[in-house]
């Protein structure tokens, strides 16, 4: 069989999907063999598919200069920041080391991640919802196949947006050593180092195997190391509203409760009134409190990590034993351990943050202290500082009463979390051929385990409050530098907390079997079929320490309750490929999944591939999909805790920003339904000549019963604009301050996503001057419309806000990842001359609108063009050396204003690498 020109072309297109210039040669006729392509259960000659699959090879990965699997995926145009999690996101708000992928921006839980065609256990952090892509070793990746189309008809749940399949090295003989170092050219942290070994063998006895081991390390980078991130205050763009030291919440009756106590800014701060916030390490907030007073806020910018300290160890192995020409046994193993240390600002403390802490339950007499930090009239600081201030703002009626005060507790230093995540997968099975039918049977066991600990910056709220609230403590919240008297300082230190506070485990055990082969003849052509079954048991367990269970550890966000739930999933699937005519193929797949907790679902996919002439390929597909709610979505017990930050500066709001409250109800919902989707795509591939090809694919994804946990900002915005769906989720006090929020998981509206993927590939021999390759891969988002639970429509392409009733309101989902870019592409050119190869890459991202500035004016981030350069040399036998620069011209970020929930300041953590210009050297040597 001789491949047609277009078949070779499409192989080049797929294999060069990124593309960064690796020369991918078409196979000769004798090399053609049937393989399984992501998106199908059938084995066929590669590239004979109606589905848009992009393939990134090992050689191409080397030319990008990426240092992690997360960074590699970010170069793919179909991958969106929307709905994903990154290392940078975890640096300022611990995610346990999770890095995830979101195709089309519809969320990482709607993109299926596979390794060698099978699932990994979801990451134990964040509810066991998504796969941590950094547990997949970059050094062991042979290629990445990205199916840019829904595939629930083949794979079941989660494949709404598409599938990312990591194929690890399997057939290798010899030993390969590689390593590299990289550093930003700017001072500070952010350095990277990595080393790996891959070894493989093939024996005459039929036994073959490959093992790999790798180590990666990233150094921490802080906000103080970058000019654009060193402060959370940058008027008129943004200002820090984080809880400051010494703000007066209001009078407090000991043993009773608050009289006129408010949130974190309420009646202002004596030092703010005199312009002396800096004496206690705070800053003057550029606005007024809900009580129209000046107050001090905490500038978290310098202390927040932009990138965490990360250490990653990966081990992989595969073993195959040929029983005979038609059967073999196989085994695969994967182990990964990541240790991520995140460091950020000191913990805040105030009365509403103590609300979830069960140690304060009961009266103060019963428990020994009040649910607030109090300063008493007999305190010298009360008389010398508080009294004159209260008189000056017309609140002499407060004098003589204890006052509730806010604190930014510097006594224990900055907060530091250490998250250790272990992931393993082990597979055993057999495959072969019986009567010309291919079969495969396998058992896989998967586990992701997370252990979270704290080292500094954390303390028992109850013990701290008890020390402060001693009427004889003489606590001075306005003391210069925060220095307290020695006796009180010693008592405070006894409240320190360190050690493990949470462990979580996500497990799955799966048995699967399938058979495929030729079905029946249609003229001169043969149809193909595949049928199979799968049985999976999933388990998710969450085990907090007693202190975390009580909600008593300051800075961890309130109570976390135990969870241990399991479920069974049984599935059957089938696929049929029919050659309808000489140039027209049709494919139909169907899968039925039975869950013992959310019911049954059946999904299908149909596609057509038409090649009227050898230079033209037309393709289209239509299918349905679903996503089952996770065990955490369904069963996580509802509990009260501290909210994330949000703003209340819209119509009918208080005007405050950076608010946190201590009375937020979160948790699962056992009444959730599975999400449903419908997907459609159609595209064309053209190759007018052997060295030029171009293609485009239109896609549309419609999702109903969208599962989400609305953010505080979404809820507050909906409540303030009068959306009926949010009115029961918020309570306010007599002064209109938000006092409580209910943010449980729900089926919340719909989404309609449309766009076009485009690629162009060109290769040209320069004769005596080598050869030139130019490749473009881009994605144009045409539409991303999502409705809120109340039916409010949000248009999300190119913006984080929509104008609703004259006010720019955060789009739904804006807090859960980054913006949906209108256009994103990677354009690369490689010139190869002798033993040298030079690659220049342009990474382009269109501009977008952010949250409004503090003065109410709109803010925009401009289009970004970041260039990377790589120079490789292979003139030494079995060795390759490369040097490179990422962000060649050291482009600095435009000023970014987040909707909320981003501790880092000044830049978009999902779009910009704060390392800036980054230089690296890599080397690889093969022993054969």
What are these regions (language model features)?
Residues 34-67, 123:
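N-terminal periplasmic "start-of-domain" segments of outer-membrane beta-barrel proteins
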Residues 69-72, 99-102, 132-134, 158-179, ...:
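N-terminal periplasmic accessory domains that precede
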Residues 74-119:
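Extracytoplasmic beta-strand/coil segments of soluble accessory domains associated
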Residues 118-148:
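Short acidic/polar hinge/loop motifs at secondary-structure boundaries
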Residues 128, 227-234, 274-310, 316, ...:
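Surface-exposed, low-complexity loop segments enriched in small/polar and acidic residues
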Residues 171-174, 204-206, 324-327, 433-438, ...:
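Short loop/turn motifs that connect adjacent beta-strands in outer-membrane beta-barrel proteins
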Residues 459, 782-783, 843-851, 872-928:
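C-terminal beta-signal and adjacent terminal beta-strands/loops
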Residues 641, 772-874, 889-890:
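C-terminal beta-barrel architecture of Gram-negative outer-membrane proteins
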